[in-house]
């Protein structure tokens, strides 16, 4: 049900925090503007409609209702029917269909209803978790892709799930390594979800994933907190902590398709509340200005604007000349082509402008040293001058380049950086302390001194006081060291020679092991005297010699690969040679003539 109440002429700026018994509105610097809903006792969840500047909230124990609305152009409280015996833990709003969704942990269901028919129709059930023991806690609407996300806080089956706003396509996207998830939010700018997980014990975590549950990352991990709900805008993540009675903030990680860069920082205490616990939180995201050209959101933003204009035009009332003049003034109130919403009395700015009247350009004072343009996504983008860099061109390239108070300058043509060093410093970045380096040379008189150190060493030897040498910052590099000495060279040479010898022995041993053996030739020749001539029919088979007339010669390795270990002689030529030697002196050179030239051929013949 809804309860509408507003008595203030100024609405909240950037944040709204639900404490136990009131809603506090704060500006961008966390300064308190005012507080509302003082007649409530047990506030919990919040939801915000940026199209009509409407904030929705829930009270667990109010006697007249469970869900309420806060709008500034209504001053009379309106009470509608109570939703039932419920315990609303999470709220979410869809501006396209003007439906309000809430998670009822007591009934274990997720309900929804149109804000236009809350007083006349009963809410409908979108998801029923009672049969499976689920405990819906935080919920969030993906306006552009028409999905509803929720956290199941049952520690036995904890999960993060989603379903279409039409009730179809339920899907569990996170179910592993999750303990007790609480609040959840959809960031339309980065197309990711963020949720709080109360870990077992004293720990907690804030995690993130893509809309389908992939690319899961831990953004913040800490302890000794009791986080409940969270909100997100362009710059940071914010969550309520019931233990410390405060709101914490953390820099929003930047994601892209190529690079994921998670900012490494510590959570900051954004807003402490000394007496009351903080529960729900919502923040202004600039949805309608930021996403007018987004591929997924542009059509939704256009439809929401058209519906707002249609509802305003359908109002029938008598207009006088004074009324027409007031209407003209209202239209002129918004600058730079912005649209004026009379019901909420606010402006919807076009891409590239912001402010209450859309009077401030997004590029105003945005780029420090460069030119600014509005990107297709509706964000300011800087084109830096040659000497500067950074998201806003706020950093000079020479920052921190020259060390030890050196002066940095840049070449306009090549953009190269050069350093002019102070006396007694040198190097490309003035990283070398010549005083320290010369002191090292001075302590080793056997080394050759650089010319630049002669004067210093002479003065140093006279004073003989090394305590006056000051230590300066360096770039992580050492100065030139004294040259190596003779004994070190000898040791190095001996080591190289020994290593070479060991390598040679190893190679030779391997060759001996794996080299195939050469074949060995073993032949036997029978040598006998000349056959007897007593018979013309005598043959070697019929006229065998006596044992005293023959001998056997075994020849091994004869002419093996041209290496003759045992000389091989032709038996047919031996007798002729010996008979001729008897007539003249023996000649050693003639022995070569009777060597066997082709042993195998002679044997075959």
Curated annotation (Swiss-Prot):
<keyword id="KW-0732">Signal</keyword>
<dbReference type="GO" id="GO:0005886">
    <property type="term" value="C:plasma membrane"/>
</dbReference>
<keyword id="KW-0221">Differentiation</keyword>
<feature type="glycosylation site" description="N-linked (GlcNAc...) asparagine">
    <location>
        <position position="27"/>
    </location>
</feature>
<feature type="disulfide bond">
    <location>
        <begin position="421"/>
        <end position="430"/>
    </location>
</feature>
<dbReference type="InterPro" id="IPR050778">
    <property type="entry name" value="Cueball_EGF_LRP_Nidogen"/>
</dbReference>
<feature type="glycosylation site" description="N-linked (GlcNAc...) asparagine">
    <location>
        <position position="464"/>
    </location>
</feature>
<feature type="domain" description="EGF-like 1">
    <location>
        <begin position="322"/>
        <end position="359"/>
    </location>
</feature>
<dbReference type="GO" id="GO:0007283">
    <property type="term" value="P:spermatogenesis"/>
</dbReference>
<dbReference type="InterPro" id="IPR011042">
    <property type="entry name" value="6-blade_b-propeller_TolB-like"/>
</dbReference>
<feature type="repeat" description="LDL-receptor class B 3">
    <location>
        <begin position="146"/>
        <end position="190"/>
    </location>
</feature>
<keyword id="KW-0896">Oogenesis</keyword>
<feature type="glycosylation site" description="N-linked (GlcNAc...) asparagine">
    <location>
        <position position="261"/>
    </location>
</feature>
<dbReference type="GO" id="GO:0048513">
    <property type="term" value="P:animal organ development"/>
</dbReference>
<dbReference type="InterPro" id="IPR000742">
    <property type="entry name" value="EGF-like_dom"/>
</dbReference>
<keyword id="KW-0677">Repeat</keyword>
<feature type="transmembrane region" description="Helical">
    <location>
        <begin position="487"/>
        <end position="507"/>
    </location>
</feature>
<keyword id="KW-1015">Disulfide bond</keyword>
<keyword id="KW-0744">Spermatogenesis</keyword>
<comment type="function">
    <text>Has a role in spermatogenesis and oogenesis.</text>
</comment>
<feature type="glycosylation site" description="N-linked (GlcNAc...) asparagine">
    <location>
        <position position="64"/>
    </location>
</feature>
<dbReference type="InterPro" id="IPR002049">
    <property type="entry name" value="LE_dom"/>
</dbReference>
<feature type="topological domain" description="Cytoplasmic">
    <location>
        <begin position="508"/>
        <end position="605"/>
    </location>
</feature>
<keyword id="KW-0325">Glycoprotein</keyword>
<feature type="glycosylation site" description="N-linked (GlcNAc...) asparagine">
    <location>
        <position position="85"/>
    </location>
</feature>
<keyword id="KW-0245">EGF-like domain</keyword>
<comment type="similarity">
    <text>Belongs to the cueball family.</text>
</comment>
<feature type="glycosylation site" description="N-linked (GlcNAc...) asparagine">
    <location>
        <position position="433"/>
    </location>
</feature>
<feature type="disulfide bond">
    <location>
        <begin position="349"/>
        <end position="358"/>
    </location>
</feature>
<feature type="repeat" description="LDL-receptor class B 2">
    <location>
        <begin position="98"/>
        <end position="145"/>
    </location>
</feature>
<dbReference type="GO" id="GO:0017147">
    <property type="term" value="F:Wnt-protein binding"/>
</dbReference>
<feature type="repeat" description="LDL-receptor class B 1">
    <location>
        <begin position="53"/>
        <end position="97"/>
    </location>
</feature>
<dbReference type="GO" id="GO:0045938">
    <property type="term" value="P:positive regulation of circadian sleep/wake cycle, sleep"/>
</dbReference>
<keyword id="KW-0812">Transmembrane</keyword>
<feature type="signal peptide">
    <location>
        <begin position="1"/>
        <end position="31"/>
    </location>
</feature>
<feature type="domain" description="EGF-like 2">
    <location>
        <begin position="394"/>
        <end position="431"/>
    </location>
</feature>
<dbReference type="GO" id="GO:0048731">
    <property type="term" value="P:system development"/>
</dbReference>
<dbReference type="GO" id="GO:0048477">
    <property type="term" value="P:oogenesis"/>
</dbReference>
<dbReference type="Pfam" id="PF00058">
    <property type="entry name" value="Ldl_recept_b"/>
</dbReference>
<feature type="repeat" description="LDL-receptor class B 4">
    <location>
        <begin position="191"/>
        <end position="236"/>
    </location>
</feature>
<feature type="disulfide bond">
    <location>
        <begin position="398"/>
        <end position="408"/>
    </location>
</feature>
<dbReference type="InterPro" id="IPR000033">
    <property type="entry name" value="LDLR_classB_rpt"/>
</dbReference>
């Amino acid at each position: 049900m809804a309860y509408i109440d507003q008595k203030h002429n100024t609405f909240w700026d950037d944040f709204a925090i639900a404490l136990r018994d009131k809603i506090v509105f704060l500006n961008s610097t966390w300064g308190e503007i005012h507080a509302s809903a003082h007649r409530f006792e047990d506030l919990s969840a919040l939801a915000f409609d940026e199209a009509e500047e409407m904030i929705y909230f829930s009270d667990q124990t109010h006697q007249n209702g469970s869900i309420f609305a806060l709008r500034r152009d209504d001053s009379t409280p309106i009470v509608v029917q109570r939703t039932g015996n419920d315990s609303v833990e999470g709220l979410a709003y869809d501006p396209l269909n003007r439906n309000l969704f809430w998670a009822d942990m007591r009934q274990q269901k997720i309900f929804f209803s149109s804000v236009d028919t809350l007083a006349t129709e009963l809410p409908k059930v979108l998801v029923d978790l009672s049969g499976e023991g689920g405990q819906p806690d935080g919920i969030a609407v993906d306006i552009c892709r028409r999905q509803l996300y929720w956290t199941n806080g049952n520690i036995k089956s904890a999960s993060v799930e989603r379903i279409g706003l039409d009730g179809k396509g339920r899907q569990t996207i996170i179910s592993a390594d999750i303990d007790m998830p609480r609040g959840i939010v959809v960031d339309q700018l980065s197309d990711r979800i963020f949720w709080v997980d109360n870990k077992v014990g004293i720990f907690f975590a804030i995690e993130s994933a893509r809309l389908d549950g992939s690319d899961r990352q831990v953004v913040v991990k800490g302890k000794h907190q009791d986080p409940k709900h969270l909100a997100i805008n362009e710059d940071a993540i914010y969550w309520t902590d019931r233990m410390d009675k405060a709101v914490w903030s953390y820099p929003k990680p930047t994601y892209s398709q190529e690079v994921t860069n998670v900012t490494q920082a510590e959570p900051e205490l954004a807003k402490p509340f000394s007496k009351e616990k903080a529960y729900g939180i919502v923040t202004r995201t600039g949805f309608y200005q930021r996403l007018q050209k987004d591929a997924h959101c542009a059509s939704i933003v256009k439809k929401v604007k058209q519906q707002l204009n249609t509802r305003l035009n359908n109002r029938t009332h008598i207009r006088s000349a004074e009324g027409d003049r007031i209407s003209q003034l209202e239209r002129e109130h918004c600058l730079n082509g912005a649209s004026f919403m009379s019901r909420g009395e606010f402006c919807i700015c076009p891409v590239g402008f912001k402010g209450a009247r859309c009077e401030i350009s997004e590029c105003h004072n945005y780029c420090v040293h460069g030119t600014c343009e509005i990107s297709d996504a509706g964000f300011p983008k800087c084109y830096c001058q040659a000497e500067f860099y950074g998201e806003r061109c706020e950093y000079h390239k020479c920052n921190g380049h020259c060390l030890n108070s050196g002066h940095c300058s840049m070449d306009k043509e090549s953009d190269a950086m050069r350093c002019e060093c102070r006396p007694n410093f040198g190097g490309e970045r003035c990283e070398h302390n010549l005083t320290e380096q010369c002191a090292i040379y001075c302590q080793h008189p056997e080394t050759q001194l650089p010319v630049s150190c002669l004067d210093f060493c002479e003065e140093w030897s006279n004073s003989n006081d090394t305590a006056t040498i000051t230590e300066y910052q360096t770039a992580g590099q050492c100065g030139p060291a004294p040259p190596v000495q003779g004994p070190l060279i000898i040791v190095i040479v001996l080591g190289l020679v020994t290593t070479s010898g060991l390598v040679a022995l190893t190679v030779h041993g391997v060759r001996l092991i794996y080299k195939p053996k050469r074949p060995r030739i073993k032949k036997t020749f029978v040598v006998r005297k000349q056959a007897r001539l007593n018979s013309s029919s005598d043959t070697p088979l019929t006229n065998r010699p006596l044992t005293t007339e023959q001998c056997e010669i075994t020849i091994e390795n004869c002419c093996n690969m041209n290496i003759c270990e045992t000389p091989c002689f032709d038996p047919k030529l031996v007798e002729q040679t010996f008979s001729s030697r008897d007539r003249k002196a023996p000649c050693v050179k003639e022995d070569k003539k009777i060597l066997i030239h082709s042993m195998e051929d002679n044997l075959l013949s």
